[in-house]
Amino acid sequence: MRKYELMYIANPQLDPEKLKGLVANLSNVITSNGGSVLSLKEIGLKDLAYEINKHRKGYYVWMLVEASPEAIAEYKRVVNITESVIRNIEVKEGE
């Protein structure tokens, strides 16, 4: 298993309960596919460098995970179809 840094920006208009559900759901994608979340940091609401999907702010969440490439592929699939996520990135640690 490899370590990855995952970061996504959630829609700033989500209410706190839906945001907690989103964070739990995306963390669960990793753990249910045999990976583990080593660290999770909810950075909070920040200004975006440029407008994304008509949003000027976004709620940033960062995770350090240890997972197989298959688990990361499933995470990418889920995060790309989740409407509440306006941007995401996955980086293999060491690159």
Curated annotation (Swiss-Prot):
GO molecular function, one term: structural constituent of ribosome
Record's keyword terms, sorted: Ribonucleoprotein, Ribosomal protein, RNA-binding, rRNA-binding
Signal peptide: none
InterPro entries registered for this protein in UniProt: Ribosomal_bS6, Ribosomal_bS6_CS, Ribosomal_bS6_sf, Ribosomal_S6_plastid/chlpt, Transl_elong_EF1B/ribsomal_bS6
A cellular component annotation (GO) from this entry: ribosome
GO BP, one annotated term: translation
One Pfam family in the UniProt entry: Ribosomal_S6
Job description of the protein: Binds together with bS18 to 16S ribosomal RNA.
Family the UniProt entry places it in: Belongs to the bacterial ribosomal protein bS6 family.
Protein known as: Small ribosomal subunit protein bS6
Lineage: Bacteria, Bacillati, Mycoplasmatota, Mollicutes, Acholeplasmatales
Gene, per the UniProt record: rpsF
